[in-house]
């Protein structure tokens, strides 16, 4: 194959890339929020009045579990409420969507994960889909839809704080996420009703959070980001507000949950050895253990041992064991040590020595593990990592700063972000060779072109196969997409000139064009990993579903509230009838019996009609009121009598009691 290099053009990001929208558009987008969409926890921040605010959710927590649950009544819970019912409803509590998003069903990591997930994961269109039971009806969700629900929660958290609608966001992803995973994350934003203006790498966001006030001279910063499910290392230089990612490496499938899993395996084996019972098949028992193991792991960051106590763990038996820090480290030492290799790789790729690193920034909850801190310190010959940043909030903080830049906020100063593509991009040439067009760690956005030709005489079509990966042969790399350029005029091999152009935008999304220079005939593909990506129709359907869910949630809440009103009214009457100090001592036995009978009737009706609709609950409450109010009215000598406690109007009387 004849190849002729045409040109290689690298575009550096300048401030104008971020502020390219005209002023009118800035007014339209409102406040842009920064969202850290994590595997286990998510966090949202906003740049306001010259500083970043990390926003607490409705439970007062600054980080929200990335959990979605569906109750037997069909109610949808997101965040803390969802995580709280993991042990009682494991099959319908979904988490770890980030470990599935943008991956194919056959991906070994997906196959490994589904062994441990308590909910059902099925294959649909070569992708993993989640199947849950929503009020007696099975429903499947794409991982993007689950992530979208978490994003909706973050959006609502920001809206409650700001007091207005939020429509635009910056969302972070692990630096080592490939194109399909990035695109799927963007799709999740669309389903959640968010315009994702920028996808940025988590370590880059953390470096922004750390380095925003570092104005003096050039600094080399190593960001070590170990979260609940992913691990990234990035090396950045910061020079007077210009952030350049020099190299990045990591593992999109390593984090705190893997450490928990090792401890769980240990205790499951230990329990079997002691009792002869295998608890693996009991999802509730396994989730109880997961919850307590996570608590113990957190405790071990501050103390040397932690007791794990679970009442009625399995078949009525309790569980009681001690986990020491030494045992925790022993169970995970190979995983801990494996985090050091990407650090060394990043140093090698940057042509830097350990001594050239000015700051080490630790990000992600798992960097609180003392052994991880020790290993990082030892690798850098005793250099202390920087402590001035909350590892849980750093990524959202940096995303919020970037969001401030996109909002056109003047207080962000001259911040410029130079990010890189994490993997080499190229095409397949004769013999299955990977011909590289964009080497990994190239600053984005970027555009590279190269001239190729035909491999045989009178070849009418060339097939362009686009790959990402570092191996010399394409069979060992990851196929991103394929397209044909047809209509090449007959000519001897090597004569036609086919120009292939790779262009990556600021979100790391790739467009590939092939042009026959002789005829001007062109074809192009935007790499969105078609087999793995949602179609526009699917996204539209999911957006509609998400809106429908929000509407259903509202209706369901109304129905539950109406049911609760009837229930609390009935039980309030029952208590008062049974209390001689209250109604019980004031009514004739006949009236008392009438009310008791009516109340019992309604309580029995409630027990057998849990799924009745709003109108039924209202009607039953009215029936009860029509029996009770005339009787109570007699006590007070007329129809103007105050209603009993728990009846309509009770809210007012409660406030006015003397």
UniProtKB/Swiss-Prot annotation:
Organism this protein belongs to: Xenopus laevis (African clawed frog)
Secretion signal, residue range per the UniProt entry: 1-19
One example of a Gene Ontology biological process annotation: neuron differentiation
Subunit structure: Monomer and homooligomer; homooligomerization via the interdomain linker inactivates the chaperone activity and acts as a storage of hspa5/BiP molecules. Interacts with DNAJC10. Interacts with dnajb9/ERdj4; leading to recruit hspa5/BiP to ern1/ire1. Interacts with ern1/ire1; interaction takes place following interaction with dnajb9/ERdj4 and leads to inactivate ern1/IRE1.
Segments for region (Interdomain linker): 410-420
Keywords: ATP-binding, Chaperone, Endoplasmic reticulum, Hydrolase, Nucleotide-binding, Signal
Regulation: The chaperone activity is regulated by ATP-induced allosteric coupling of the nucleotide-binding (NBD) and substrate-binding (SBD) domains. In the ADP-bound and nucleotide-free (apo) states, the two domains have little interaction. In contrast, in the ATP-bound state the two domains are tightly coupled, which results in drastically accelerated kinetics in both binding and release of polypeptide substrates. J domain-containing co-chaperones (dnajb9/ERdj4 or dnajc10/ERdj5) stimulate the ATPase activity and are required for efficient substrate recognition by hspa5/BiP.
Gene: hspa5
EC number per UniProt: 3.6.4.10
Protein name, UniProt field: Endoplasmic reticulum chaperone BiP
UniProt: ATP binding residues: 38-41, 98, 228-230, 294-301, 365-368
């Amino acid at each position: 194959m004849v190849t002729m290099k045409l040109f290689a053009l690298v575009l550096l990001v300048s401030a104008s890339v971020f502020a390219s929208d005209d002023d009118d558009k800035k007014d339209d987008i409102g406040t842009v929020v920064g969202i850290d969409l994590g595997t286990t926890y998510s966090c949202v921040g906003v740049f306001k009045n010259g500083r970043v605010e990390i926003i607490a959710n409705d439970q007062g927590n600054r980080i929200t579990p990335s959990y979605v649950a569906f109750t037997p009544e069909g109610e949808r819970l997101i965040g803390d409420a969802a995580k709280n019912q993991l042990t009682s409803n494991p099959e319908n509590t979904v988490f770890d969507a980030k470990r599935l998003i943008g991956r194919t069903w056959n991906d070994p990591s997906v196959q490994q994960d589904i062994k441990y997930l308590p909910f059902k994961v099925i294959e649909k269109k070569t992708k993993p889909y989640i199947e849950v039971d929503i009020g007696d009806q099975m429903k499947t969700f794409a991982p993007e839809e689950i992530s979208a629900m978490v994003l909706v929660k973050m959006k609502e958290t920001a809206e409650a704080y700001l007091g207005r609608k939020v429509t635009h966001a910056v969302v972070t992803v692990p630096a080592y996420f490939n194109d399909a995973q990035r695109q799927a994350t963007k799709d999740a934003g669309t389903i959640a009703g968010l315009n994702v203006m920028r996808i940025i790498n988590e370590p880059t966001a953390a470096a922004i959070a750390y380095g925003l006030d570092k104005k003096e001279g050039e600094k080399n910063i190593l960001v070590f980001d170990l979260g609940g499910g992913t691990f990234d290392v990035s090396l950045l230089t910061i020079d007077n507000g210009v952030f350049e990612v020099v190299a990045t490496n990591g593992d999109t499938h390593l984090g705190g949950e893997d450490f928990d899993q090792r401890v769980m395996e240990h205790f499951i084996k230990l329990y079997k050895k002691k009792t002869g019972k295998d608890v693996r098949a009991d999802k509730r028992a396994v989730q109880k253990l997961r919850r307590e193991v996570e608590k113990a792991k957190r405790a071990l960051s501050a103390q040397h041992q932690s007791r794990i106590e679970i009442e009625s763990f399995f078949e009525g038996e309790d569980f009681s064991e001690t986990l020491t820090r030494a045992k925790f480290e022993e169970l995970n030492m190979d995983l801990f040590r494996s985090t050091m290799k990407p650090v060394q790789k990043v140093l090698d790729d940057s042509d830097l020595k350990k001594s050239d690193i000015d700051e080490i920034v630790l990000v992600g909850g798992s960097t609180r593990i003392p052994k991880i801190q020790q290993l990082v310190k030892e690798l850098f010959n005793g250099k202390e990592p920087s402590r001035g940043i909350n590892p849980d909030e750093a990524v959202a903080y940096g995303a919020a700063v970037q969001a401030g830049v996109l909002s056109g906020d003047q207080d962000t100063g001259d911040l410029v972000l130079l990010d890189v593509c994490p993997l080499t991009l190229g095409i397949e040439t004769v013999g299955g060779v990977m011909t590289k067009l964009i080497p990994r760690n190239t600053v984005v956005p970027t555009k590279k072109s190269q001239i190729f030709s035909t491999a045989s005489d009178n070849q009418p079509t060339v097939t362009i196969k686009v790959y990402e990966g570092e191996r010399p042969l394409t069979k060992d790399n990851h196929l991103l997409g394929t397209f044909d350029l047809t209509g090449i005029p007959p000519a001897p091999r090597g004569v036609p000139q086919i120009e292939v152009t790779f262009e990556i935008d600021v979100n790391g999304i790739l467009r590939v064009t092939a042009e026959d220079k002789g005829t001007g005939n062109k074809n192009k593909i935007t790499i969105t990993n078609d087999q793995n990506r949602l179609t526009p129709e699917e996204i539209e359907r999911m957006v509609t579903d998400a809106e429908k869910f929000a509407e259903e949630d509202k209706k369901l809440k109304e129905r539950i509230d109406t049911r609760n009103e009837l229930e609390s009214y009935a039980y309030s009457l029952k208590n008062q009838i049974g209390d001689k100090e209250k109604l019980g001592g004031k009514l004739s036995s006949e009236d008392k019996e009438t009310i008791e009978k009516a109340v019992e009737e309604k309580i029995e009706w409630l027990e057998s009609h849990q799924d009745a609709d709003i109108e039924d609950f209202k009607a039953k409450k009215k029936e009860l009121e029509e029996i009770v109010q005339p009787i109570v009215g007699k006590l007070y000598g007329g129809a103007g009598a105050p209603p009993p406690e728990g009846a309509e109007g009770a809210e007012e009387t409660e406030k006015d009691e003397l």
